[in-house]
From Swiss-Prot:
The keyword Zinc-finger does not apply. InterPro entries: DTM1 (IPR039955), Spc1/SPCS1 (IPR009542), TAT_signal (IPR006311). The keyword Membrane applies. This is Signal peptidase complex-like protein DTM1. One of its GO terms (cellular component) is signal peptidase complex. It is a multi-pass membrane protein. It is found in: Endoplasmic reticulum membrane.
């Protein structure tokens, strides 16, 4: 399953979650908040350039070297290995904090 298929499935699951949230809470605002949070969550996981972030975190603010692979080679490689995500401790702490806070705020809004 490539990135496109994963994105499609994520968006369909998000649409189902938005419909369920809207029906259960009878609130268009809460359904829209669910949609917004879901889009940001999906974008945060599926869209980043993992080749850029797979470097040491101290190198994130410097440009990538010019000797990168061609776009065709990178696309072919991504099709075979969708999850190039390496669980570095700093990255995991950052993502857990951001997504945890976002999920908490979303839940407090939807459950109110």
């Amino acid at each position: 399953m490539g990135r496109d298929e994963m994105l499609r499935r994520s968006l369909v699951a998000l649409a189902a979650a938005v419909v369920v949230t809207g029906v259960v809470t009878a609130s268009v605002r809460k359904a829209a908040a669910t949609y917004g949070f879901g889009i940001l969550a999906i974008a945060g996981v599926l869209l980043p350039d993992w080749e850029f972030f797979d470097r040491d975190y101290s190198q994130w603010l410097t440009p990538m070297p010019a000797s990168r692979r061609t776009a065709a080679e990178a696309a072919a490689d991504r099709e075979h290995d969708v999850w190039k995500f390496k669980p570095y401790p700093l990255r995991m702490a950052m993502l857990t904090t951001i997504y945890g806070f976002g999920l908490y705020k979303w839940w407090m809004y939807v459950s109110s």
